[in-house]
Amino acid sequence: MHRGHEPTTRAIDAQKRYYDLRAPDYLTGGPADRGTGASESTISLLECRALVDELRPVGQVLELACGPGGFTRELARHARSVTAVDASPQMLARNRIEVGAPNVRYVEADLFAWEPDTAYDVVFFGFFLSHVPPAAFEPFWEVVRASLRAGGRVAFVDEDDRAAERDEVQLLEGVPMARRRLGDGREFDIVKVFWNPDDLAARLRDLDWDISVRRLDAGLFAGVGVDLRA
């Protein structure tokens, strides 16, 4: 998947820098991307476990944008192996410390330029889809498609449109962005797209995915489904 669109590339680079700097105090159980002093949607470790237990991700699992490890830990309990990919070396270091599972392999890569080297039984991403710029949405889902074995499943968790009331999103060069502040006062703009679950399911159906997207508590949604082209 190629970034292409220059505003999208700038947005992705700023977003990566923010998460590099946020890694040391990022919560393992939720998005926690609003920075110091802000209201945050979080998902407890028990909720992480319940969602992954429901998914039952056996075999080889790919986790995109693995972050500090809240979901990685639970995926590793079920899977034969987990490949955890993230653009941030600081997040990967935090994940290794938090998870410490022998069946997890870590890959540092820009997810907007990365290509899978094998196919997986399950592809999972938690709190990442809302950070995918509109211009990268279809290319991102082609990466997901290329990562899945025939009969494989994709699953994800994220904030939905109800969470938009906690944020202020502005279009910057056509990319929906939200302002985040670090503890030292520095500010960054990150991509933030709040999907309505029905709209997301319909959009994915147009791309030949059969994915059920349901609302959860606390302004979150979960999706699971299959590639109709497989």
At which residue positions do the language-model features occur?
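A short glycine-rich, Lys/Arg-flanked "PGG" loop and its adjoining helix->strand segment in the class I
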Residues: 138-150
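Conserved class I S-adenosyl-L-methionine
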Residues: 2-56
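Conserved beta-strand signature within the Rossmann-like core of class I S-adenosyl-L-methionine
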Residues: 151-159
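A conserved beta-strand element that flanks and buttresses the S-adenosyl-L-methionine
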Residues: 124
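Conserved Class I S-adenosyl-L-methionine
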Residues: 190-226
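Short catalytic micro-motifs in class I SAM-dependent methyltransferases
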Residues: 127-128
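Class I SAM-dependent methyltransferase SAM/SAH-binding core
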Residues: 62-113
